[in-house]
Amino acid sequence: MKVTRAQAEANRERIVDVAGKLFREKGFDGIGLNELMQAAGLTRGGFYGHFESKDELAGLACERALMANQHYWEELSAKPPAEALRALVGFYLSDLHCQHTAKGCAMAALAGDVARAGPALKGTFETGVDNFLRVLEPLMQGGEPAERREQALAALSQLVGALVLSRAVRSPELSGELRAAAGASVLRSAAAG
């Protein structure tokens, strides 16, 4: 049975969505094409009808995951700056976010894989980082734009770093301490301006 153009596009979108979750959960090298396509409800043979390579899919999945995360941050940042930053930090460093890698922050889940990737994927990732910084900068209390930029860079580094470390340790107590300390530091720094 011939697949319609609309169905082919829907299949492609499903593959990208599933890949975004599986790549965040298992890394780019932690999932093979068979498992990925099976999770999307399709056969491996159809993969190359949609993508030239797994790298192409990784770029698209990374971009989509970063955009979804960014949209959520933008929703949270619609509040007054101090309230928005508290909401963003609270969500980002929550137990729920820490435990759900597949639906969580693409920066924290994929940074290690992207560091070993080629320039195209690094460019996609960098665009995502820049977009997150644009959300954070207005939430900082610094006077000059350069100061707010520096605060946003430090805040993003602390948030992502704390999430990465808290997912990597065995102890739930240490995981919580890492996230609590980073959150307190980000909020203190932003308020000090």
Set out the residue ranges of the language-model regions.
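Amphipathic alpha-helical packing segments from all-alpha helical-bundle domains
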Residues: 67-70, 74-76, 86, 103, ...
